[in-house]
Amino acid sequence: MSLINKEILPFTAQAYDPKKDEFKEVTQEDFKGSWNVVCFYPADFSFVCPTELEDLQNQYAKLQELGVNVYSVSTDTHFVHKAWHDHSDAISKLEYSMIGDPSQTITRNFDVLDEESGLAQRGTFIIDPDGVVQAAEINADGIGRDASTLVNKIKAAQYVRQHPGEVCPAKWEEGSESLQPGLDLVGKI
């Protein structure tokens, strides 16, 4: 089931905040009023996951400039996130909150739970300030994601929100032309 254009479901979870080195509660209400990226991954202390989360950290400053909050989520607890942060060179660089979802509530809400393993699939979601999913990417377990493409997707989502009636074509970049769908454009692209 696609979550595009759907409001995220309610949840309450504990997260590890590496910036403050503390645990905190996170709910769907924390997503309201700003853009958010939620990056699901299978497990702490694994192999592809730290490379993805470090790559996301490498884009963190750009995401912050765009007013985007970043959250990673796995079915591990927030305690395990803290231990991983304290022991992994890649994960020790993270500045964004790491949500623990041992109840699998959030993972189920976003429809990325692998029922057989009980782990999250590799899913990335862009959520607008109204708490509505605007973009989603889900990869097979062995395929890591590229966070640099995420920045441009967010810019496109923000542009479309600010310019109703316009759409961003493939490979759209900030400053390039958008399209205004209409009868005069049919068959001319």
Swiss-Prot record:
- Carries keyword Disulfide bond? yes
EC number(s) of the enzyme? 1.11.1.26
> Which stretches are annotated as coiled coil?
none
User: Which residue intervals define the domain Thioredoxin in the entry?
Assistant: 2-159
GO terms assigned for molecular function? NADH-dependent peroxiredoxin activity; thioredoxin peroxidase activity
| Reaction(s) catalysed by this chain's protein | a hydroperoxide + NADH + H(+) = an alcohol + NAD(+) + H2O
Biological process terms in GO annotation: cell redox homeostasis; cellular response to stress; hydrogen peroxide catabolic process; response to oxidative stress
Sorted alphabetically, which Gene3D superfamilies does this protein's record hold?
Glutaredoxin (3.40.30.10)
Write out the catalytic residues in the record: 49
The entry's localization annotation reads: Cytoplasm
> What GO cellular-component annotations does this UniProt entry give?
cytosol
Q: Which UniProt keywords apply?
A: Antioxidant, Cytoplasm, Disulfide bond, Oxidoreductase, Peroxidase, Redox-active center
Output the Pfam families linked to this UniProt entry.
Answer: 1-cysPrx_C (PF10417), AhpC-TSA (PF00578)
Family classification: Belongs to the peroxiredoxin family. AhpC/Prx1 subfamily.
- How is this protein organized at the quaternary level? Homodimer; disulfide-linked, upon oxidation. 5 homodimers assemble to form a ring-like decamer.
* Miscellaneous comment text of the record: The active site is a conserved redox-active cysteine residue, the peroxidatic cysteine (C(P)), which makes the nucleophilic attack on the peroxide substrate. The peroxide oxidizes the C(P)-SH to cysteine sulfenic acid (C(P)-SOH), which then reacts with another cysteine residue, the resolving cysteine (C(R)), to form a disulfide bridge. The disulfide is subsequently reduced by an appropriate electron donor to complete the catalytic cycle. In this typical 2-Cys peroxiredoxin, C(R) is provided by the other dimeric subunit to form an intersubunit disulfide.
Task of the protein: Thiol-specific peroxidase that catalyzes the reduction of hydrogen peroxide and organic hydroperoxides to water and alcohols, respectively. Plays a role in cell protection against oxidative stress by detoxifying peroxides.
Protein's recorded name? Alkyl hydroperoxide reductase C
UniProt organism field: Staphylococcus epidermidis (strain ATCC 12228 / FDA PCI 1200)
Please name the gene that encodes this protein.
ahpC
